[in-house]
Amino acid sequence: MAGQPEVQVSRLLNERGLSSFHVKLLIWSFFIVLIDGYDIGAIAFAAPSLIRAWNLKPGELGPVFSASLVGILFGSALFGWVGDRYGRKAALIGSNLLFGIFTFAAGYATNLHEMFWLRLLAGVGIGGVIPNVVAINAESAPRHLRATLAIIAVGFVPIGGAI
């Protein structure tokens, strides 16, 4: 618009420094990534019950463990693109919704085949979280804190797995 000064967002971010917005964003990131980390590790604790309930041999559950990791691979690429195209917030909402629906449904799986596909699809949602949490924290941070905030945000995954 004519007559109004041009605003450079990157300059404003760098001048402002760390704010309560960044702390709140990091707290939200903590909970989102913590839940994803928990889900990645939770199947290991459910395995003995599933083996007994479905009369499986221990090795038969291996593909279910791998399914979520394969889903994470595809989810990272898919939701990374969604975040670039439609925004990080939309990508985080979509990936968490996908993850939540299929993780909930996995609780009602009646056989190995169902569990495999539900864990694969939940993995797609989980995979979408990490690149977008890293990006949203880095993009909103002052230049000198970008790497630090991004690493802190993604560092919560193992904490979730340890719970």
Please name every model-derived segment.
Residues 1-163:
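Transmembrane-helix signature of 12-pass secondary carriers
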